[in-house]
Amino acid sequence: MAQQTPLYEQHNLCGARMVDFHGWMMPLHYGSQIDEHHAVRNDAGMFDVSHMTIVDLRGARTREFLRYLLANDVAKLTQPGKALYTAMLNASGGVIDDLIVYFMTEDYFRLVVNSATREKDLAWINEHAEPYGVSVTVRDDLSLIAVQGPNAKAKAATLFTDAQRKATEGMKPFFGVQADDLFIATTGYTGEAGYEIAMPNEKAAGFWSQLVEAGVKPCGLGARDTLRLEAGMNLYGQEMDEGVSPLAANMGWTIAWQPEDRAFIGRDALEAQRENGTEQLVGLVMTEKGVLRGELPVRFTDDQGNAREGIITSGTFSPTLGYSIALARVPAGIGDTAIVQIRNREMPVKVTKPIFVRAGKPVTQ
């Protein structure tokens, strides 16, 4: 039986179409995925992301532990509340999960990990935390609501206390702050400004209904996927998994190679991959009729005249741009164009950087 978040009844009240998403009953949409998408790009929308797992790590050696566990380096986190996006790798350099880590105090860090990978993540973290004497606490007592869009912060702030407004004033992207009973972070999965707000489960339903009254549109998994794809953000299980290197998933920027003497899980494998070369993640744009979908083959001829083939990892119709976009993992050597096989048709596509929309504006040329 699929689990329900504390907002399940709110979703039904808002007219959601519910689906089983990795063992959780979650809203796919509330009537129109397209309208929800546009609300986030142009105004403010909100998502129930309580199915994600919040993990608190405590202990004197927590920073040392995370410097070993994660490919990015928490030594960069010197200001309380600062957050970091990173991969957690296996020994062969594959991605166990991508996650956000927050520096709270010197002996207290917070992780937010994906729902689909929850059990293996927790097993991996617990296994490696033990030698460091780090305690691992899963915060199932917290709900998480993402409020996203150009007007999201202003509308969310109408629910804040004076202390919460003061705590979030002038907050830069990728920070989190505990303000009374809310943990408010300037993070998201849409390419828009906004907050991800963690709160006690018993407060979530009331907070959600107040956001509705403040003019924030409830949004489901469908809009969440088209928004993150436009923003060029990876989805675990599609752009990367335990068999895919972060170097092949446009995540090279999240690997902290310096200092050279920092040993982290997967480092040796990554260094070999960097030396030998890997596939790469690119963007695809198709302005002709049709929709690019995951698993479709991408074919091109490299500069040596060799026929090469990759695969679309995620594809959709872009509501913001009005045509189809995709992310694809391809061998090195791809040029500016390629061919995608859609049923029995060979469709020409333009190859771009793996990002299509930034702050509501097209970036694809």
UniProtKB/Swiss-Prot annotation:
An example Gene Ontology biological process: glycine decarboxylation via glycine cleavage system
EC numbers for this chain: 2.1.2.10
Catalytically driven reaction(s): N(6)-[(R)-S(8)-aminomethyldihydrolipoyl]-L-lysyl-[protein] + (6S)-5,6,7,8-tetrahydrofolate = N(6)-[(R)-dihydrolipoyl]-L-lysyl-[protein] + (6R)-5,10-methylene-5,6,7,8-tetrahydrofolate + NH4(+)
Keyword Repressor among UniProt keywords: no
Gene3D superfamilies from the UniProt entry: Aminomethyltransferase beta-barrel domains, Aminomethyltransferase fragment, Probable tRNA modification gtpase trme, domain 1
One of the record's GO molecular function terms: transaminase activity
Main EC class the enzyme belongs to: transferase
GO cellular component, one term: cytosol
Family to which the UniProt record says this protein belongs: Belongs to the GcvT family.
Functional description taken from the UniProt entry: The glycine cleavage system catalyzes the degradation of glycine.
Name recorded for this polypeptide: Aminomethyltransferase
Native species: Cronobacter sakazakii (strain ATCC BAA-894) (Enterobacter sakazakii)
